[in-house]
Regions:
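Active-site oxyanion/phosphate-handling segment shared across diverse enzymes
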Residues: 141-171
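Conserved donor-nucleotide/metal-binding helix-loop-beta segment in metal-dependent transferases, i.e.
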Residues: 107-132
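Acidic donor-binding segment of Leloir-type glycosyltransferases
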Residues: 49-71
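Short phosphate-binding loop-to-helix
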Residues: 66-98
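N-terminal nucleotide-binding beta1-loop-alpha1 segment
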Residues: 1-21
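Short glycine-enriched, charge-decorated loop/helix-capping segments at active-site entrances
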Residues: 21-29
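The conserved acidic donor/metal-binding loop of glycosyltransferases
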Residues: 101-105
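A short, N-terminal amphipathic alpha-helix
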Residues: 32-50
Length: 171
């Protein structure tokens, strides 16, 4: 373990990214936007203390990781939750971990630094989106019960409460 934190950014592929915007942006615009958001995440979290990984089983995502000079986790599993659970086996090698959606538009270097500091003092940090999704979840303890999908924040928080994890909701 050379670095303190591991950050995973799951992304299926670039074939139909951000499909919820298909009535506003054409496919090439959505691909450019998705790549731009991933680049921003990589730059904001890039530091001597963080190992950043794109999580996927798509060769185009591996090429993108190489272009961005970040790590690639080649998931053997299929499906977001299974891929992230597989990736989470690496958490034990780090003091802190974070799973972050690949399309977060509001991340800045200040935000990234603040989140990393918050991880150090928390078992679990979790964010809730307007649609009750989980744009990011992070922590300093072993965790592998990811429940992304519809109303994932509600599923995560229910699991955390039932299993008596201390967690802090931010944002």
């Amino acid at each position: 373990m050379n670095r303190k934190n591991i950050i995973g950014i799951p992304i299926k592929n670039l074939k139909e990214p951000m499909s919820r915007l298909d009535s506003t942006l054409d496919k090439n615009q959505r691909i450019s936007l998705q790549i731009g958001l991933i680049k921003n995440l990589a730059e904001c979290f890039r530091s001597k203390d963080n190992d950043i990984f794109l999580i996927s089983n798509d060769s185009e995502i591996e090429k993108l990781a190489n272009q961005l000079e970040i790590n690639f986790f080649n998931a053997k599993s299929v499906g977001l939750n299974k891929e992230v659970i597989e990736f989470s086996k690496n958490f034990k090698n780090y003091q802190g971990w974070m799973i972050c959606h690949s399309d977060l538009p509001y991340v800045t270097k200040y935000f990234a630094k603040t989140i990393i500091q918050e991880i150090e003092g928390s078992e679990i940090l979790i964010a809730k989106s307007k649609d009750s999704g989980t744009p990011f979840i992070a922590g300093s303890i072993s965790f592998d019960e990811f429940r992304f999908g519809v109303k994932s924040f509600d599923k995560h928080s229910k699991y955390l409460k039932e299993n008596k994890f201390e967690y802090k909701q931010i944002y």
